[in-house]
Design a protein with these regions (language model features):
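Extended, well-ordered alpha-helical scaffold segments
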Residues: 13-23
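C-terminal functional modules
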Residues: 26-169
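Glutamine-centric residue-chemistry signal
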Residues: 1-2, 83
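Short, small-residue-biased leader/transition segments that mark boundaries at the very start
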Residues: 2-14
């Protein structure tokens, strides 16, 4: 609902819906009261690898939990989706779908990409490959699926709904 609120004319303030969503998540996971968290202006910290400093990385997600009614629409969307990602993270596939759909939250980049160029380091894996049971068990179906996919059967090929307009520099 809060996602819809910033893209239309809501009957309730988007801040109310945002805070309601965070409070619901806190309640669902029984992690206490959300008030202090919702007032927090803390942002993600840089990752510092003390053993291999070249693996250290600057934080990319720089939005805090505190709602700012004066923030840009895009910043509000980033806050909403980041909180949604946190809330649905235990359901990894759902969290991954949200991140692919919106580009939020902004995640640390892959530092060692072993995909032989099949997966973009910045946008990460976009889909899972078709299972071996289809590839070997029904080659005609596999060929048809690859044709409908519109690209190779790799983790870097975008799905029909994954338009690529969801990543910002």
């Amino acid at each position: 609902q809060q996602h819809k609120a910033i893209h239309s004319f809501p009957t309730r303030r988007s801040s109310d819906l945002y805070e309601q969503g965070v409070r619901s998540s806190f309640s669902q996971w029984r992690v206490g009261e959300a008030n202090a968290y919702l007032r927090s202006d803390h942002v993600a910290a840089d990752f510092v690898d003390t053993f291999t400093p070249e693996y250290s990385a600057k934080a990319l997600c720089l939005v805090s939990p505190a709602w700012d009614e004066e923030a840009s629409r895009e910043t509000k969307l980033e806050k909403i989706i980041t909180q949604k990602w946190i809330a649905c993270y235990p359901e990894g596939c759902e969290a991954w779908a949200e991140q692919r759909r919106t580009g939020y939250p902004r995640l640390f980049p892959v530092l060692v990409n072993k995909s032989n160029g099949k997966i973009d380091t910045r946008t990460m894996i976009r889909r899972l490959n078709f299972p071996v049971s289809i590839i070997s068990g029904n080659p005609a179906q596999y060929s048809a699926l690859c044709e409908y996919l519109g690209g190779p059967d790799t983790g870097g090929t975008r799905l029909w709904w994954d338009t690529g307009v969801n990543f910002r520099d």
